[in-house]
Amino acid sequence: YVEVIGGRAVVPSAGPPCFLDRDLFGNNMITGDELSIFPDQTEFIKRMEVLGNGAAVMNIPGTAIEISPTEVRVMHPVADDKVREPFDNKAAYLQQYQADWAQWLADYKDTWPKDHTDLIATLQAWWGPLLAMAPMLRAAVGGGCVMNTDGLSIYIDFAGGVVVPFNGQPHKYKFTIARPLLEAVVASKAVDWSNSLFLSCRFSAWREGEYNEYLYNFFK
């Protein structure tokens, strides 16, 4: 896209996330050797340079970019020599970030529902009509999906277009999600589960075969 458009400036601006949960902290890419899909701005810029494009613009929260017909002006909220500090000392930066937000994160998780609701009935009422409208997507998913949570296993029957209890039915996909988080996502009627749940990495998953874009699209 950059080559086709011929952009004078390329701004990496979609991440990376910061995983501050203690059990997810290892998902942060710190040394570059981690099994992570979340590189930072500096890695993006290096990749651009390897490809022969020096138009990438370094940015951090608060960076302002002014674009005119003759120039691209970048103004950072800190001195230029401080811009790379979070990246050059990433472990210490993230550990401090985690400590600063620990109480807020604990308070936020405490807002998740503690009571159990009838998730199967709620999801069937919500998703049943959507599944009925999407026969081609259901066929493309190609199998059932199990959602395991505390005290409950839910089966999304894409072939039949219903949400029912899981009782050993054949399936190609499985998610395990903590009940309070799942209850919160369902209660809010989250339209895009990728942003509301999956990008947080607060779940585990299993699949048979290749990644299926259609299943992901259903949750979006």
Roles of regions detected by a PLM:
Residues 1-52:
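Cap/insert and terminal regions of metallo-dependent hydrolase folds
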Residues 13-17, 54-65:
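Acidic carboxylate-rich catalytic motifs and surrounding loops in phosphoryl-/glycosyl-chemistry enzymes
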Residues 58, 63-220:
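Feature captures hydrophobic
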